[in-house]
């Protein structure tokens, strides 16, 4: 509506309610009600400023949910802040939310008064689920962990996500790809870097595509590692035999498949490449992109005479090979 009006109102449960209205008012078709994005802190600290305004709060956690219409039992939280909700509109979709989901809620703030007690409240008009909380990812003292989910998820606050990719020089490197708050596409296997602690994973819906050059893979349940389309060596995030260097190391003898943990990521390398003959790679090397097939190959008494060129391609024999440098059992061999 547009125009000037004279109204009579009463205060009911802390809300100014119009009882009569007079004036020259023109109805506007298809009008859009302005909506202001606010935080819980905004509403709680100055409810009067936003009273009867249409506002929207984003990415807050549903602590309790409605069980019926005309229900005041639901609350949303943001850290230590908590706001009561009122399901006063029959069209409200908030009743469909799940506890612990991260939600966006649109409504009208007011001060609910009962028994001389005033409570800041948001009368819900509508809302939607932004993300659903899943089990937390544990980051150890080493400040690293891995993650893999069938659904998209938001990178936890304080965490950074890395993929593993070829560095174009016969080696691999960890590439910083997702910052805190970023939406990670479904089925994206990651190394996470964050201070020690448990980090909630908030699942979301997204059509974004996972990076296709990622050498990390994962499973949503405890399952044998497997990558289709070739023969692979498999590496698990763990410490080396000395227990002093965290990285990706063979999870089973000779890089064979191993049982991967639920929602964990692992590294898979084509067994025909020079890199796959390495027993493992420290995160320090991977983070700086200095890992190559030459300086990471680990020799053993039972190692076969595999031969590779400097691009990591395996060749059958040095007989008839073009002039150049080749790698055999981790040693450089010059063909003149």
Where are these regions (language model features)?
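Contiguous mid-protein beta-loop-alpha structural module that forms a pocket-lining wall or clamp
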Residues: 1, 164-167, 190
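OB-fold nucleic-acid-binding modules
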Residues: 1-134, 298
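A short, polar beta-strand/turn micro-motif
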Residues: 15, 19-41, 130-157, 180-246, ...
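Short, surface-exposed beta-edge/turn micro-motifs
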Residues: 52-54, 71, 185-189, 263-264, ...
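Append "Rare intracellular matches occur via the same short Y/T/C beta-strand/loop motifs
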Residues: 101-107, 188-192, 323-332
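Short, exposed beta-strand-loop hairpins at the edges of beta-sheets
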Residues: 111-118, 267-268, 325-327
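C-terminal outer-membrane/trafficking sorting elements
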Residues: 165-166, 287-336
